[in-house]
Amino acid sequence: MPDTIQEVLQAFASGELVVVTDDEDREGEGDLIVAASLCTPEKMAFIIRHTSGIVCAPITTEDARRLRLDPMVAHNESNHTTAFTVSIDYKPDGGTGISAEERASCCRALANPNAGANDFARPGHIFPLIARDGGVLLRSGHTEAAVDLCKLSGLPPVGVISELMNDDGTVMKGEQVARFASSHKLKHVTIADMIAYRQAREKLIERVATFTTDSPIGPLQGYAYRSPFDEIAHVAFVYNGVGDGKNVLTRFHKPNIVRDIFTGQKRMLTVLEHFKKSGRGVLVYLRDGAAGVPVAPLPQEKSAEADRNRQWREVGVGAQILRDLGVTSIRHLTSSVHDYKGLSGFGIEIVSNEQLEV
């Protein structure tokens, strides 16, 4: 069973190795991760012994530019767009670069802000990976998880990661990963838990405008929001205020250009009539394909990662908009049944799901 984020961060900040597992519909695999600044030869030897031996070092875009670490290939065709740079060794070590001591030294040098591009030989035995800005909130991969763990622990944002393997050469998955973490007394966390932790503690939206607009049921108060992840504004429309913020009838709207143009008016009128009957209501309009907070069901095709990452962001953006409006619990007006996860982390409760029939 995964440990709490707080337990993992405490262990990570003290230089311990931790195990991080991603989603089953992505890879379902576990990586050993340690902060590069605290990586010792002993920890590197443990990593090499229990993993594929391909040791990677997640870094930020800023550090990659500073150290002139160019992409390994011009056109990335990997299944999960893992951003490999050219491989490196640390020149001052002077050896082949393959030993645990030399690889640990190279990783520590990557985390040293005083190190420069000329301190590293190319190619080498450490494989830097460029993490997406925004971390696990933008890409739910081990690369981003490693950098996020460093940042959340107050350490230089460079990690060391490698994928856990069984003795027969197969990749560890699921319960195998959990048993490994338990047998070696390593803290274990999922990327999903890291996403939820960040969402509940970071401000993902900013109110940028307030306005009033007319509607068939009377004036609506509009609130426009921006997030770091979207170029366009999200909007919430409030009918008759939210009062004490409890049991507020709420509709999350998923934009669909064709539907909204040709059949959307009837649906919106029905939503507004429900608001009028209830006496108050909130319509959260998350643009650019955002639907609100549904996490399941998810698309089954391999391209689902982008959809899943977007939906994780919607959990935070949609919930934080409600929180900004003073809403603490909602009656969810929905035309389909979803599994809504993540709202409770923002102090928002779904009291009921009420069917929207058009």
Could you say what each language-model-derived stretch is?
Residues 1-358:
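Catalytic domains of riboflavin
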